[in-house]
């Protein structure tokens, strides 16, 4: 609460999950899938203790997904369906989750770097007009990740469900001219895993199966350190094969797919996306930075988001960065490589890093009125109130 007794809410709306809670807390109060479902066949039945309604959101929608047509309101970190997004926010602020009187609260929201201005304007409009929050702030996710890590300078590799960003931050300011975006993230890897399992002869078709495969991915996938070796193992042995029991009781076997799916992060051509993978993108970003800041950036690479949780990802990233540095900067001079210092931080709670940083920032700022955009300012200026964030509104 701030000095006037208003609650300060932090809401990290991810493409895949909503993480919400209060300023100063060190864990989100609620984490639930960002999905909205409508029944395929209208019926008034109950499933277990959940009643099927015309509109199901979050956890309930996820549990009953086999009977629903499921929609994700966000794609690649951008809101695509505002009506469904409002249903998601109603659920977040309503009795199911936070149960707050929004008129008497301030809210800190997060957004990916390089997000379209129109998207941000609309979010602010909805927060003030529909929910009538007394104050709103929108923070860039990568900056919050560094705050949570206690840093002001570093490069954040943030890979969630909808989008992967490489975002250098210097002295607490994100550097948009160096920020790189890769439209491959958790959801694409799940899609690719479905395709690989189809090739093995397992059929997944309904939107409900998507959630099932996501769970398989989270349980079994990893990033291979040496792809040639992994492929050899997959072809010649069965050491990689694991069994997984599906919700309907069937058992499937997953082998080489375990490392082949996340490989798309490093080799986008596997899923027909043009461009370089996450390691080369990170290398290019740091090399494009000012020569004086490069070594700082190499020493403070911070992983964030659920799609950086694969076992083996930090070591593979480090291996590829060293290889690229050796080839392109040192021109193959191995002797000099020992002077190249690199550190990749992979905090165990990186799934919720953005929320944690938001909770820290909101707590520090809760009584600083010049920090928040207020409802009164919005009524006077409309979306031009965003100038307060240091974001020019065109």
Curated annotation (Swiss-Prot):
Protein's UniProt keywords contain Lipid biosynthesis: no
Keywords associated with the record: Acetylation, Actin-binding, ATP-binding, Cell projection, Cytoplasm, Cytoskeleton, Nucleotide-binding, Nucleus
Would you tell me the protein name for this molecule? Actin-related protein 2
Where is it chiefly localized?
cytoplasm
Q: Which GO terms describe its biological process?
A: Arp2/3 complex-mediated actin nucleation; positive regulation of double-strand break repair via homologous recombination; positive regulation of lamellipodium assembly; positive regulation of transcription by RNA polymerase II
Q: Which residues carry this modification: N6-acetyllysine?
A: 299, 322
Describe its partners and assembly state. Component of the Arp2/3 complex composed of ACTR2/ARP2, ACTR3/ARP3, ARPC1B/p41-ARC, ARPC2/p34-ARC, ARPC3/p21-ARC, ARPC4/p20-ARC and ARPC5/p16-ARC. Interacts with AVIL.
Query: Which positions are annotated as binding ATP?
Result: 160-162, 214-218, 305-310
**Similarity remark:** Belongs to the actin family. ARP2 subfamily.
Instruction: State what this protein does.
Output: ATP-binding component of the Arp2/3 complex, a multiprotein complex that mediates actin polymerization upon stimulation by nucleation-promoting factor (NPF). The Arp2/3 complex mediates the formation of branched actin networks in the cytoplasm, providing the force for cell motility. Seems to contact the pointed end of the daughter actin filament. In podocytes, required for the formation of lamellipodia downstream of AVIL and PLCE1 regulation.
Q: Corresponding gene?
A: ACTR2
Q: Which Pfam families match?
A: Actin
Asked whether the keyword Disulfide bond is assigned, the reply is no
Q: What GO MF annotations does this protein's record show?
A: actin binding; ATP binding
Where N-acetylmethionine occurs, the residues are 1
Superkingdom as given in the UniProt entry: Eukaryota
| Cellular component, GO annotation | Arp2/3 protein complex; cell cortex; cell projection; cytoplasm; cytosol; nucleus; site of double-strand break
Q: Which PROSITE patterns match?
A: ACTINS_ACT_LIKE
Where does it reside? Answer: Cytoplasm, Cytoskeleton; Cell projection; Nucleus
By its UniProt entry, which CDD domains does this protein fall under?
ASKHA_NBD_Arp2 (cd10220)
